[in-house]
Amino acid sequence: MKEAERKRKILYHQHLTSRCDAQTAARDVLALQAQFLRHAQMSLRLRTRDDSWKQWVKQSVKTRAFRGTLHLLDAEDRLLITSALWKDYEHRKYYMARYYTPQEEQLFCNAILDLLQQGICGRRKIYTRLVAMGLDEKLCELACSSWDGLFAVLNIQGKVMFQHAASREFAYAPISLRSDLDACRKELVYRYLKGYGPVTLRDASYFFGWKKKELEAVLQKIHNVQMSDCNGSTVYELPEEIDAYPRIPTAVFLSGFDPLML
């Protein structure tokens, strides 16, 4: 496969040369990285043919997803994405784990969930309540830090989510995670190939935050994955019946953290 052909396919699958409605675009790229809301909005606007992106953003779910970072994703995909990814953090493989023992973490998380269920959502208010419970003040501060602290852990576990796309406060919103981890990962990688292919193992490894061997094992379970050589690298894609892909634009001005760059 020539590099130009690969680029045409990727731009088409990313809806940068095949604009569509907002929900289709958002689901095909799986999620929009949202450290800055305006970047996620611009990424979606580039891929939509109308103003449907505005309503989609209002109805989207803001949560931590791929690589543990903030994303906007379609409400229909929250269960699949969270179920496929939360296991990556099950063994306390995140930065907050260095500050808390497992027992302390559980104590703080339970206290935060109780307060959220009472409708106390502001970080400062939750911090004040935790301190009033007699908990260690430094750990209370870390739990409610501007980097989301233990809220990030609860977010990744599917127990809380942000109140809306522009919010920095969380809401109690638990979901019953699927137990079929392998099936979830297979479905997610299949959709990744559909929206990002042709991809290299290195591309996929960065996107998911998984080791290449893990991804190879998942790819082997997906029916009809096609492999080609492109500039000395193996690329993976799904078969499709398209005679010709749109030409590569002279320039495409992307937002920060655009899915194409990730």
How should each PLM-predicted stretch be described?
Residues 1-136:
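Phosphate-backbone binding and catalysis cores of DNA-processing enzymes
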Residues 57-70, 155-165, 223-230:
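A short, conserved structural fragment
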Residues 74-78, 166-183, 234-244:
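Short, cationic-aromatic polyanion-contact patches
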Residues 214, 225-262:
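Non-catalytic regulatory appendages
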Residues 30-31, 56-60, 149, 223, ...:
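Intrinsically disordered, low-complexity boundary segments flanking structured domains
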Residues 113-142, 191-232:
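Internal, well-folded beta-alpha domain core
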Residues 140-216:
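Loop-centered beta-sheet repeat module
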